Every structure is written in structure tokens, then in C-alpha cells.
């Protein structure tokens, strides 16, 4: 839960890598209380944000990136294409 600013993502990704986890899941499908704060499914409804954040995760980490999309959208193909364009592994 960080702002959509590259430097913030770069910092948090370093912390995530330090945990030695196996990958990153971008939960852009979370509808519960996050969309009101500009996170979760709010980001997942804007393909440009999906592509941008996914790209940052790929650029600033060595881990695979999984993008969890929101079903609360008219056409899931747009966010799916954005995730792919950003370099998502799944």
C-alpha cells in the first residue's frame, strides 16, 4: 500500500526482496476499503496505472510479478493487456 510514485515503489520493493519471498502479487482486485483510498481495485480499473506499477516492479526487483485483476470492470481484457505490457509474469 504505497502511493503510485516510482520512488516509493522502488523503496518498498527493496524491503520486499529483503524478506527472500518468492515473488510479488499486485492485488489490484481488492474492493474492500481500498478503492476509497485510491488503492486496490481503484488502481485495477485504470489500465495505465496497472502497466506503470507492473513495469516498476519488474524494473526494480528480480522477482516474478503476478497481477491480480479486479472483476469489477466492464472488459477485463484492457487491464489484462496492460499487465502483460508492463511485463507481468502472470
Question: Predicted regions span which residues?
Answer:
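Glycine-rich, N-terminal phosphate-binding loop and its surrounding beta-alpha-beta segment
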Residues: 1
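Alpha/beta enzyme core
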Residues: 4-90
Amino acid at each position: 500500500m504505497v502511493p503510485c510514485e516510482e520512488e516509493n515503489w522502488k523503496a518498498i520493493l527493496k524491503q520486499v526482496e529483503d524478506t527472500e519471498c518468492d515473488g510479488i502479487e499486485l492485488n489490484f482486485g481488492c474492493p474492500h476499503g481500498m478503492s476509497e483510498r485510491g488503492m486496490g481495485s481503484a488502481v485495477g480499473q485504470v489500465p495505465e496505472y496497472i502497466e506503470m506499477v507492473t513495469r516498476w516492479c519488474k524494473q526494480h526487483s528480480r522477482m516474478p510479478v503476478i497481477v491480480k485483476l479486479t472483476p469489477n470492470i466492464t472488459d477485463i481484457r484492457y487491464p489484462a493487456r496492460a499487465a502483460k505490457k508492463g511485463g507481468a509474469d502472470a
